């Protein structure tokens, strides 16, 4: 029997089942029913292979299996074959964005820019919907649906092929949708077949940004602020200098144990400064030596996640030069975004630094701090970049439990719900639909805790606004875990409390 005949028989079988059993999705459900039914019949009834019933069940099972194999490649059940390969070929680690290769690599612009892994992942999607169930954008009325990203790529490849020069964004994938992603990683964490949604989305963003297709006023202003001012807030570096002088922060000279990375929020944002100064009070109490960089710019996290690798590279190279000049050995930061970018993304810029989040430091030294006077009910919010990205869950909880009565929210740890700031979205203007921060604030307020503990300055800002909107008259106060730890310290005469201003 030649290949053409086999193809025709397969086509005839598929069409026949489509019209006879339309409710069974081209007969696949019936085939699966026969496969499982005959297997269970043989197992439960203990049929003798030589008996008539045994032979009938064997032939039915074998026929269903032989029919199922050629049909599977034309249906969504193809994932049964491709998913193990996808998992095996995944990049390893969580949401690792591949570097651009060469001057002509602009990201995912057309089908020809996609790799075999991208195509493989598109056809591996089970269509289970677990990614969309946990996506903060999808669950707050945005058009982004991570499942549809994979299915859109699949439709593109079916229509045009992987080597096509047709643009990816347009008929099958929405530009608006890909820029609604907070890069929280919930989709990637939940996917049972290992589809790496975030590298796909960032690749598509790269293509839109590098070709000039994405024309967003807020995004353009953000990139200009990063280039001109070195921070996404557009603040002058003189403000950082004034803060360092006013707060009497020592400069790092290579002899201290830690280089305290201020970050943009720690250097310029009032709430971020309060969190940073709380950490410095604890470090001073513990007798740990530290210093700060004289000059420091944004790590490039927002630029990287929004697809502007040029700005990211410029910022990374400047900061790497500053750190290498003072021979920095060990860094500490209050910002999980900074920790992830410095510890992971900067490796592609040729640098490797040891850096830890302040929750790890505080948890390690928790036993050395005085016991708290009172323990207020406090609910902890897991930041996406501290939890799913850095897999740090227990340490911040230990800090909270050491200072307060720890309360847990329903969606927590690996399944925590995003605050809405990641992926550069904190700087892209008003959201469509419900604000992600408001959705999370409703969950946190429902615990009836008097205090919300954060471990990320972006979460702190987003949730502060969200809680105020949800409960304008009696909103829970929000504090950083460093502030909880610092509150356990004895008050010293003449202590400075207004250095964040």
Predicted regions and their residues:
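Short helix-terminus and kink motifs of transmembrane alpha helices
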Residues: 28, 32, 36, 75-83, ...
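Membrane-embedded alpha-helical bundles of multi-pass integral membrane proteins
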Residues: 37-109, 113-116
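Short, charged low-complexity linear segments at domain edges
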Residues: 90-117, 151-171, 393-402, 421-433
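Cofactor-cradling patches in redox/metallo enzymes
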Residues: 262-357, 385-401, 405-501
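Hydrophobic alpha-helical positions that pack around
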Residues: 380
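Polytopic transmembrane helical bundles with strong interfacial aromatic enrichment
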Residues: 1-39, 50
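Iron-sulfur-cluster electron-transfer modules
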Residues: 113-116, 122, 148-150, 157-341, ...
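Non-transmembrane accessory domains of multi-pass membrane transporters/channels
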Residues: 95-146, 183
């Amino acid at each position: 029997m030649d290949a053409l005949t086999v193809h025709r028989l397969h086509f005839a079988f598929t069409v026949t089942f489509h019209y006879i059993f339309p409710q069974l999705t081209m007969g696949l459900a019936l085939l699966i029913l026969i496969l499982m039914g005959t297997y269970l019949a043989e197992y439960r009834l203990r049929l003798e292979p030589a008996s008539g019933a045994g032979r009938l069940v064997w032939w039915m099972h074998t026929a269903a299996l032989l029919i199922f194999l050629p049909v599977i490649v034309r249906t969504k059940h193809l994932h049964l074959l491709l998913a193990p390969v996808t998992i095996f070929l995944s990049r390893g680690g969580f949401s690792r964005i591949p570097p651009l290769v060469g001057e002509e690599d602009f990201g995912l612009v057309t089908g020809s820019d996609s790799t075999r892994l991208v195509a493989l992942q598109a056809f591996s999607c089970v269509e289970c919907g677990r990614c969309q169930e946990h996506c903060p954008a999808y669950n707050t009325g945005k058009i982004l649906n991570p499942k549809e990203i994979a299915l859109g790529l699949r439709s593109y490849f079916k229509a045009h092929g992987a080597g096509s020069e047709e643009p990816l964004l347009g008929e099958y994938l929405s530009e608006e949708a890909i820029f609604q992603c907070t890069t929280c990683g919930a989709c990637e964490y939940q996917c049972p077949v290992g589809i790496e949604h975030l590298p796909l989305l960032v690749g598509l963003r790269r293509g839109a940004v590098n070709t000039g297709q994405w024309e967003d006023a807020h995004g353009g202003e953000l990139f200009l602020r990063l280039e001109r001012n070195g921070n996404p807030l557009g603040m002058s570096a003189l403000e950082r200098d004034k803060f360092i002088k006013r707060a009497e922060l020592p400069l790092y000279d290579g002899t201290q144990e830690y280089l305290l990375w201020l970050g943009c929020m720690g250097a310029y944002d009032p709430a971020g400064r309060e969190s940073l100064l709380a950490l410095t009070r604890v470090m001073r109490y513990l007798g740990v030596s530290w210093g700060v960089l004289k000059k420091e710019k944004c790590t490039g996290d927002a630029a990287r996640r929004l697809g502007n690798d040029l700005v990211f590279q410029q910022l990374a190279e400047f900061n790497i030069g500053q750190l290498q000049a003072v021979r920095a050995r060990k860094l500490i930061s209050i910002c999980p975004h900074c920790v992830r970018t410095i510890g992971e993304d900067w490796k592609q810029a040729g640098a490797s630094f040891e850096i830890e989040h302040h929750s790890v430091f505080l948890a390690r030294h928790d036993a050395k701090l005085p016991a708290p006077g009172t323990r207020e009910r406090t609910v902890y919010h897991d930041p996406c970049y501290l939890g799913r990205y850095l897999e740090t869950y227990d340490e911040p909880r230990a800090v909270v439990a050491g200072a307060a009565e720890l309360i847990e929210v329903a969606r927590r740890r690996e399944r925590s719900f995003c605050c809405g700031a990641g992926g550069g979205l904190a700087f892209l203007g008003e959201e469509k639909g419900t604000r992600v921060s408001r959705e999370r604030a409703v969950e946190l307020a429902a615990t009836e805790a008097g205090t919300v503990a954060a471990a990320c300055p972006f979460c702190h800002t987003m949730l502060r606004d969200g809680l105020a909107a949800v409960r304008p008259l009696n909103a829970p106060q929000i504090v950083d875990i460093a502030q909880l730890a610092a509150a356990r310290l004895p008050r010293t005469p003449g202590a400075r409390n207004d250095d964040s201003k």
